């Protein structure tokens, strides 16, 4: 089974990806992971990507596509794969489909973990971490016993820069701009499925398993 995983930052994609990978015995392929693997392995594709990244430039679509194509051509992807973080654009989606058609293959499901923007905003901006031991908290779902103080070591808890309101808003704006056209694309391809990501982890996965079991 060949699956594309879609969803906003903070929707729990990483957690569900691990569960899907284990349940269906397919590799979870994160774009970030394969970029890092190519760069650390000093592959030709990795060195090209590093050249752009070192200059603070976005890696071009063509190179990103080549890196993904190389990864899904490996033996462990013969029975399928789960792509997380790719495609990000319709151009990438079309290139992936063209590559798969050439191999007489296709995407079986574009799975959207759907969480309303307001819910994601609250999830992310409410996160806190201990400034010393790194313990994780949330002001609403998992607060410290004493406000602002780590339960484990007594150090102050802080909000990471990535979780500030401005940063989260920008990340969600970027996601909306990039992903809405992808959702339309995969809906038109009749492979889009959606699950309610506001539920607890086990219930979300139960819904995912039911959706994928029907394919």
From Swiss-Prot:
Listed CDD domains: ADK (cd01428)
Binding residues annotated for AMP, in chain numbering: 31, 36, 57-59, 85-88, 92, 160, 171
Listed name of the protein: Adenylate kinase
E.C. designation(s): 2.7.4.3
Gene that this sequence comes from: adk
Residues the entry annotates as binding ATP: 10-15, 127, 136-137, 199
Pathway: Purine metabolism; AMP biosynthesis via salvage pathway; AMP from ADP: step 1/1
Function in brief: Catalyzes the reversible transfer of the terminal phosphate group between ATP and AMP. Plays an important role in cellular energy homeostasis and in adenine nucleotide metabolism.
Gene3D superfamilies from the UniProt entry: P-loop containing nucleotide triphosphate hydrolases
Region (NMP): 30-59
One GO location term (cellular component): cytoplasm
Residue segments, region LID: 126-163
MF (Gene Ontology): adenylate kinase activity; ATP binding; zinc ion binding
Amino-acid positions noted as binding Zn(2+) in the UniProt annotation, renumbered to this chain: 130, 133, 150, 153
Catalyzed reactions per annotation: AMP + ATP = 2 ADP
This protein's domain notes: Consists of three domains, a large central CORE domain and two small peripheral domains, NMPbind and LID, which undergo movements during catalysis. The LID domain closes over the site of phosphoryl transfer upon ATP binding. Assembling and dissambling the active center during each catalytic cycle provides an effective means to prevent ATP hydrolysis. Some bacteria have evolved a zinc-coordinating structure that stabilizes the LID domain.
Keywords: ATP-binding, Cytoplasm, Kinase, Metal-binding, Nucleotide biosynthesis, Nucleotide-binding, Transferase, Zinc
Record GO biological process: AMP salvage
Major location (coarse): cytoplasm
